[in-house]
Design a protein with these regions (language model features):
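Short acidic-glycine-tyrosine-enriched beta hairpin
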Residues: 35, 70, 74-102
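Conserved hydrophobic/aromatic beta-strand scaffold that supports enzyme active sites
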Residues: 28-30, 41-45, 62, 81-83, ...
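A short mixed-secondary-structure module that forms the rim of ligand-binding clefts
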Residues: 52
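Glycine- and acidic-residue-biased ligand/ion/polar-headgroup-sensing regions
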Residues: 47-48, 57-76
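A short hydrophobic beta-strand segment most commonly corresponding to one strand
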Residues: 91, 104-112
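Histidine-centered divalent metal-coordination motifs
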Residues: 55-57, 98
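A generic beta-sheet turn/junction motif
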Residues: 35-37, 58, 104
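A short, N-terminal "cap"/entry segment at the start of jelly-roll beta-barrel domains
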Residues: 1-38, 81-83
Length: 112
C-alpha cells in the first residue's frame, strides 16, 4: 500500500486505500463505476519519488491533484514531462502513453 506523509491540509487517514493487483507504488479508492458508459471515478495515491508502470488511457481522462505533487514522465521514465501541484486540473488525451508518480511527499489525484 502506498505510504507517505499526509498533508496538513488533506487528511487521508480515513480513506480505505486498496492495492491494484501486483502494481507497486500506488493505492486506489474506487468512488464509482459506470459500466454502461465505461467510466471509473477513483482516487489514486502515489508513493513519494516513485514511478508506476507505463500505461495508456483508453479514453480522455480528467485529473485533479488533491494533494502533493503529481509527476508525469516520458515512457522511458528518464525524462519528466510535467509536474503538477495541488489544485492543478487537466485532461489526459486518449492513447497518451506515459508513466507517473508522486513527488517528494507523494500525491493524491482524483481521476475520472
Amino acid at each position: 500500500m502506498a505510504t507517505g506523509a499526509s498533508s496538513p491540509n488533506f487528511d487521508d487517514r480515513h480513506i480505505r486505500w486498496q492495492t491494484l493487483g501486483d502494481f507497486k507504488h500506488l493505492s486506489v479508492m474506487v468512488l464509482d463505476i459506470d459500466v454502461s458508459n465505461n467510466i471509473v471515478d477513483f482516487l489514486v495515491k502515489f508513493e513519494p519519488n516513485e514511478q508506476i508502470f507505463v500505461h495508456r488511457h483508453l479514453a480522455p481522462t480528467n485529473i485533479l491533484v488533491i494533494d502533493g505533487e503529481h509527476v508525469v514522465y516520458e515512457t522511458s521514465g528518464a525524462a519528466v514531462k510535467n509536474v503538477r501541484q495541488t489544485g492543478k486540473a487537466w485532461i489526459t488525451p486518449k492513447g497518451d502513453a506515459h508513466t507517473e508518480g508522486g513527488g517528494r511527499a507523494g500525491a493524491i489525484v482524483h481521476t475520472v
